[in-house]
Amino acid sequence: MGSETITQGFKRAPHRSLLYALGLDEKELEKPIIGIASSYSEIIPGHKHLDKIAEAVKYGVYSAGGTPVIFSTIGVCDGIAMGHSGMKYSLASREIIADSVETVVRAHQFDGLVLVPNCDKIVPGMLMAAARLDIPAIVVSGGPMLAGDYQGKSLDLHNVFEAVGEVKAGKITEGELENIEKAACPGCGSCAGMFTANSMNCLTEVLGMALPGNGTIPAVYAERIRLAKKSGRQIINLVEKNIKPSDIMTREAFKNAICVDMALGCSTNTALHLPAIAHEAGLDLELDLFNDISRKVPHICSLTPAGIYHIEDLYRVGGIPAVMKELSEKDLIQLDQLTVTGDTVGTNISRVGYIDHKIIRPVSNPYHNQGGLAVLKGNIAPGGSVVKQAAVADSMMVHRGPARVFKGEEEAVDAIINGQISEGDVVVITYEGPRGGPGMREMLTPTSALAGLGLDDKVALITDGRFSGATRGAAIGHVSPEAASGGPIGIIQDGDIIEIDIPAKSLNVDISEEEFEKRMSNFNPELPDISGYLGRYAKHVSSASTGAVLE
């Protein structure tokens, strides 16, 4: 065991002395020492209850014969960080989380690891650490928030963002907005739709790194506590059998994750995080693979913001195992992949009985014949760009319109709110990429403003930044290379005609080849003048097309 490095032999007497200072005894030092990485926080609604989840994990570890120790990581609430300079730190925090978990585990020689995340960047950050460390590990997340209710209508955080635009459009009053904001988020948990946090929690389950139910059991249900206890017990089995993340997170497991990603219509951020996790596992998850799988896998669950259902609705009809079972009927899932249950995917989903086809449509009758995400390429995005096609209006799947170019989110939001954007326009936001932002901010505020004004099916938006999972509309992000790295998005000018063809997977600016080359040769990219962590991040971060990992 790794912990024997700090517990065994006379030379380790000083180490044992410090462990005794924790209240541990001789018997506890003979057992596997399990690190519990908790991202409990009083500023993140999705993490407010993780102290209770971590304690339940601790109980499970004890009951199975292990010695649990809890340690902490940081986290950022993307919703609170949205729309201001704080969002520059969100994606960048993913790397800090991965590094911090690695640091604590290696420094203290744990035998196994239970990861307790919940929200957007914490889940992938912890999975990156698990892949990097490659010791027995299991994830148990905090679970989704329940949907709110206002005047008999279910709602969630994305409704609040869009309501801001509705106030500006005169559709609702500020008093109504206040009522909506107080009703949308009724308690702890990750925001209730198929946004980034829930997307990643569901895909963690698909990858095999979490027990069935991890993605959909609501945060406030007692079943979530039982899942945490069970996860604590299961890590001891994984340690005893030496089942490691490298045994579970194989290329085929990632293909399963992308398959379910497409079926659910998950956040575009999955196209950043899955490649980043795979990178830590020594695997290359190219963007083209997302398109290859999307062409084969239909979109069978329409959850908010694309549809009307919430994660709790998916939970009630069997959750992720039921989705995988439905997909397996058409041989779209690799069933022989090992999971943290100790069983294969096939064994896990064999327990699924009746599937409610109101929430989970049959593969033969999907919402869309192709998956939820699409990767677009062209002269604007030779390295690729990503759109949640499941949340794009039919009228915007093919669009041609004049560019309205803005350097940074704030300029674009001001123009949208002040009525300077017309039907048919293509809003282009530059210098928001991983390096140019830096930090690749989410553009939820401008897309929500467009939706609130009733323009989400009339105006497109493209950017080298990214989008919240709560975004809907013709929002194309992750344009690579980014402007700060000399990408062609940086040469687009006001009035240029932008051609978007999502079915054809293309994104282009309609200018002559000679004009294109002239602009590129005269292009001098701007780099951010920033110090501190973001300054270091900007120097080392890779392209969005490779997961925005640090090089």
Curated annotation (Swiss-Prot):
GO biological process, one term: L-valine biosynthetic process
This protein's record includes keyword Magnesium: yes
Pfam families linked: ILV_EDD_C (PF24877), ILVD_EDD_N (PF00920)
Record's catalysed reaction(s): (2R)-2,3-dihydroxy-3-methylbutanoate = 3-methyl-2-oxobutanoate + H2O; (2R,3R)-2,3-dihydroxy-3-methylpentanoate = (S)-3-methyl-2-oxopentanoate + H2O
Keywords: 2Fe-2S, Amino-acid biosynthesis, Branched-chain amino acid biosynthesis, Iron, Iron-sulfur, Lyase, Magnesium, Metal-binding
GO molecular function (one): magnesium ion binding
Binding positions (Mg(2+)): 78, 120-121, 442
Recorded metabolic or biological pathway in which this protein acts: Amino-acid biosynthesis; L-isoleucine biosynthesis; L-isoleucine from 2-oxobutanoate: step 3/4; Amino-acid biosynthesis; L-valine biosynthesis; L-valine from pyruvate: step 3/4
Cofactor requirements of the protein: [2Fe-2S] cluster; Mg(2+)
InterPro entries in alphabetical order: Dihydro-acid_dehy_C, DihydroxyA_deHydtase, DiOHA_6PGluconate_deHydtase_CS, ILV_EDD_C, ILV_EDD_N, IlvD/EDD_N
Active site: 468
Modification type N6-carboxylysine: residues: 121
Documented EC number(s): 4.2.1.9
Record-listed [2Fe-2S] cluster binding positions: 119, 191
Record function comment: Functions in the biosynthesis of branched-chain amino acids. Catalyzes the dehydration of (2R,3R)-2,3-dihydroxy-3-methylpentanoate (2,3-dihydroxy-3-methylvalerate) into 2-oxo-3-methylpentanoate (2-oxo-3-methylvalerate) and of (2R)-2,3-dihydroxy-3-methylbutanoate (2,3-dihydroxyisovalerate) into 2-oxo-3-methylbutanoate (2-oxoisovalerate), the penultimate precursor to L-isoleucine and L-valine, respectively.
Subunit structure: Homodimer.
HAMAP family documented for this protein: IlvD
Family membership noted in the UniProt record: Belongs to the IlvD/Edd family.
Protein name: Dihydroxy-acid dehydratase
Organism encoding this protein: Halothermothrix orenii (strain H 168 / OCM 544 / DSM 9562)
